[in-house]
Amino acid sequence: SETAAPTTESTTAPDPKPVLSGDAALKDGETYTGRAPLPLVDFNVSDPENTRGLSTEKHGYGYGIAKDGKPNDISVNNQKYFETNGYKALCLDTKSTDKVLYLTFDCGYENGYTAKILDTLKEKQVTAAFFCTLPQVKENPEIIARMINEDHIVGNHSVTHPSFPTLTRLQMANEIKGMDDYLRTYFGYSAPFFRFPMGEYSDSALDAVGSLGYTSVFWSVAYSDWDLKKQKGEEFAFNTVMSRL
């Protein structure tokens, strides 16, 4: 975030030259969005040596399948755990009295569908959150710029997509900062939302990410569109998702 406290620890700087997939290279001070570049910020991760002994045990995120319009108890208990322990993390909106759906997408690579998704969202006048890795951003700057200019959230999904529980807290900060630096420099953009690669987290990781000013965003409904063996057509996909809302 813009208000992150300074630190003397080494952090990852953005690449001096972006990887381009469009027209001529950007000139100094230009961005893909047409916005002014944002100043870089230093990230100060709290308790870098984890002297408090927060658990580093790896958890694979589970959410359970909702039924009859009610979220699964697993998702409910996940959110209670986050709130009880003071973690800046969301998997379920427990505040709203309305029936609200938040659309989120993980973008670790491009497979030709993102532009179509953006077309549909624009047609339906819906905004969403796209959690992107640095390679996705560098290789598809026009798509990322479109997300930003059409008022979607481009969330931080790390530089190299590692399992965060296997990293030190300083390494976690560098993964997040490297992505944020690039967005600030070449897109004039930053957003304080993070998604753990592969949904793998630990108590220490939740705490570290929160100390950087980021909210960790999980989910309570999902469809395995990444598994090609499970695809049975758009009607099946639609009915599966709708039955879990």
Model-derived segments and their meaning:
Residues 2-104, 110-116, 123:
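N-terminal pre-catalytic segment of deacetylase/amide-hydrolase enzymes
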Residues 99-101, 111-113, 117-118, 122-237, ...:
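Metal-dependent polysaccharide deacetylase catalytic core of the NodB/CE4 family, i.e.
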